[in-house]
Amino acid sequence: MSFSSNVKAELCKDSLSKKSCAVAEGYGVLLYCNTFSSTEIRIITESRDFAARLPRLFKKAFGITFDQEPAAQDRGKLQFAISSEDKIAKIFETLQMDLKASLTLHVNFGMLEEEAECMAYLRGAFLAGGSVTDPAKRYHLEMTTSHYKVSRETCALLIECGFSPKELSRGGNNILYFKQSDYIEDFLTAIGAQVSAMGVMEAKVEKDLRNGVNRRVNCETANLTKVVDASMGQMAAIRALEEAGELDKLPGKLRETALLRRENPEATLQELAAMLNPPITKSAINH
């Protein structure tokens, strides 16, 4: 399964013990699902865990069943639908929405007075319209709805809860998203996916360690290249002196250093300085 599927599977382990939280979660699902109108509700998902949760969620929150559910053997996109006027009226009544009014969807904050209800709403929104990228590849979590006011008001709710989502429009959809690993960790923890949040944290630690190792390797490689280049230049000079019969005419310490370099072409200046008798400093041998 993908990381996003694993997150949704973890979220679906919530027990649905509190009615108000079930209503809030159902509210999030409806505002972020495929179709939510006064005549039809349609929810399409590829998450089998979410598909297994939906009938229990709607029974707990609204006391209703779906008119259409996927068959047990169905694969791919799983579809749920409600077209019954009575059932839709029951949902609207529970959510304190006017069935006969012109329906411009927005978030009724009166339904989300407690923190647990806010988190349940966000959990439902993510289950219906959210996704998160494998943190080993990159950091990106988003929630998508076709309803502009819903997205703007959900953004306000997230900000009130201490998050800083970014917004964009794409293909007629309104998207809230996070690209910072710490925001993704905190969001997943808040809506009930603590194990997945730890997965994001572990991926970040691994990336930081790997980047640190790469930086050190690059630095050491660059230093080694400098040592090799310097050594090759010194070896060429020593050979030229030797061929000209000038090597033995060098002053004692310089001659000793040249002979050590000829015998130890891969040694650093610091290592050569330590080989001299008596040893001298790196700066002295460089001079």
PLM feature segments, named:
Residues 34-36, 134, 167, 234-239:
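Short acidic (Asp/Glu) and glycine-rich catalytic loops that position anionic groups and cofactors
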Residues 43-45, 142-146, 275-280:
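Short helix-coil junctions and helix-kink-helix linkers
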Residues 36-42, 136-138, 268-270:
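Short acidic, hydrophobic short linear motifs in intrinsically disordered regions
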Residues 24-32, 120-128, 259:
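Short, hydrophobic/amphipathic alpha-helical patches that form generic packing surfaces
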Residues 52, 56-201:
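DNA-contacting interfaces and partner/effector-binding or oligomerization modules
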Residues 1-94:
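N-terminal low-complexity or simple alpha-helical regulatory segments
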Residues 190-287:
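Extended mid-to-C-terminal alpha-helical interaction segments
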Residues 15-23, 111-118, 248-252:
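Structural motif
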